[in-house]
Amino acid sequence: MKQFDVIVIGGGHAGVEAAMAAARMGVKTALVTLHRDDIGTMSCNPAIGGLGKGHLVREIDALDGVMGKLADTAGIQFRLLNRRKGPAVQGPRAQADRKLYRSAAAKIVAGQDGLSLILGEAAELLHERGQVTGLRLADDSELQARQIILTTGTFLNGLIHIGEISRQAGRWGGSTSVTLAASLRPLNLPLGRLKTGTPPRILRQSIDWESLHQQPGDEEPVMFSYLNTVPEAPQVSCAITHTNPDTHRIIRENLARSAMYGGRIDGVGPRYCPSIEDKVVRFADKESHQIFLEPEGLDSDLVYPNGISTSLPEDIQLAYVRSIRGLERAQIAQPGYAVEYDYVDPRALAASLEVKNLSGLFLAGQINGTTGYEEAAAQGLVAGLNAALKAQGREALHFSRSQSYIGVMIDDLTTRGVSEPYRMFTSRAEFRLSLRADNADQRLTPFGIDIGCVGQERRAAFSEKMRRYTAARDRAESVSFTPTELSRSGIEVRHDGARRSLFALLAQQEIPQDQVLALDDQLVLQDPAIIRQLATDALYHQYTDRQGKDAELLRKEEAVAIPAEFDYDALSGLSNELKFKLNQHRPATLAAAANIEGMTPAALTLILAVIRAGNRRSA
């Protein structure tokens, strides 16, 4: 019997990150997956990052995880989302070549010391007296370990739906995990069903590209990994088109044939990634919905039409696709489908992602009720690090909400649970002004160095960056000017006699940065990346104290009673999701409202303000 410290089941994004993290920590690790080609597969959209999600990728990278490096290797278009807004809510995103990503993932796994790849089907968890002991494979061979990480994605009792047709599978061309799912039942884990979906894949040559608006990447691409500066692969454009009233008519007339609207699906789907059927029904007043046509790779014939996931029959899929501009002669190479799967209520987990009632069993990814590669990878990292620490007899890691988006997600999952697939948004974080994508390394890399998961290359690069940053920060804070001196240099500020440091001037967006840098012959020579970081820190420095006070105020006001007749529908600042859940739960206090799934700090602040205003009026 082969013996390991940690066994990871599943080679998707959570599994790869978990296995790599455990191995980096120096424990003997096995990654069990059915096929070598499964490693790093992008089952749905060919992209990494986005709003909130890009923050997670940066945090993974700061702890020497691999998703950011893989995305940089396979990225064929890079865009910084929300570029016109503040850095706190900007999100790096990359269109990825599926084949390049999968190849890079397999290569990085093969090259990791202390990590063994085992090809086979996981059939049964072995345990005795409340402790995991190992894993039995479908060929009856056994692997021994006291720490096992389940990263099964959509494969636990996975069921694909295309119209009236259903079959067992976790994704197109794959199988499902029935025997492993059966071995979980005696553990009395709180199980539920969720669903996700994917659109049909269209042959590239059947699209009329010339009739469509092209969307190129950024001229100055922003990489995910702090170790990279430029893309490795050639860059391409995507295209944009839209549905129309004819598209919507075809869908409405065939809703009964949709697996979801025909009553064949029990699982709850992701609220913020609705199927095209959902869009047509829920947003009946909209005449069109945007579709991004995303190439699946440099040499791939397939295009991913982002925005039209579906469970309609194949003939209806073809009909509505061909009603869309640019797709009039489209050929579908693979139909869209919905997939249902088992998940575990994450409230059954500790913050380490270890199951509370079975020592040594960790869960990560979609099995915990999340959706998205990035959320899965971040959980994989947490589970991998904690499984390794447990194997070493060390204390578990705790990621706090004030420290990282990873901490926000883990806390949301393990304290609030999920009733629908969980997706990360910047609005979920109380401290989002300080939890930015640009400073993830400053927040987390020292932490990673302390626990031992950061390699020498990153340690050296981070040390050099912080040496240069600290020198620039010290210089910017020590050099100051009077209003008169600034006026002579063409910079006008209030003539109040107060000296202003270069750091304070960088925070004033109305003053061109070049003018500020020209004031000092040392600062102007600094690396542009260091200056960008310095300017961003200066900008948010004035707000972070207020952010902390706001968060503390909410904590102090948790006992505030919410009137039974409180009208949530009248609050224009609340999302429809929160209005529905607040009306459903009718929380008695602000603390009870805070524990509702999907609740945000901004929503709590709004509710508190309305209650206070009402109290003042009645006084």
Swiss-Prot record:
Keyword Lipid biosynthesis part of the UniProt annotation: no
Database matches in SMART domains: GIDA_assoc_3
One of the GO biological process terms: tRNA wobble uridine modification
Cofactor(s) needed: FAD
Cellular localization per UniProt: Cytoplasm
Keywords assigned: Cytoplasm, FAD, Flavoprotein, NAD, tRNA processing
Main location: cytoplasm
Gene3D superfamilies, A to Z: FAD/NAD(P)-binding domain, GidA associated domain, C-terminal subdomain
Database matches in InterPro entries: FAD/NAD-bd_sf, GIDA_C_N, MnmG, MnmG-rel, MnmG-rel_CS, MnmG_C, MnmG_C_subdom, MnmG_C_subdom_sf
Residues annotated to bind FAD: 10-15
Family: Belongs to the MnmG family.
The protein's assembly and partners: Homodimer. Heterotetramer of two MnmE and two MnmG subunits.
Protein's recorded name: tRNA uridine 5-carboxymethylaminomethyl modification enzyme MnmG
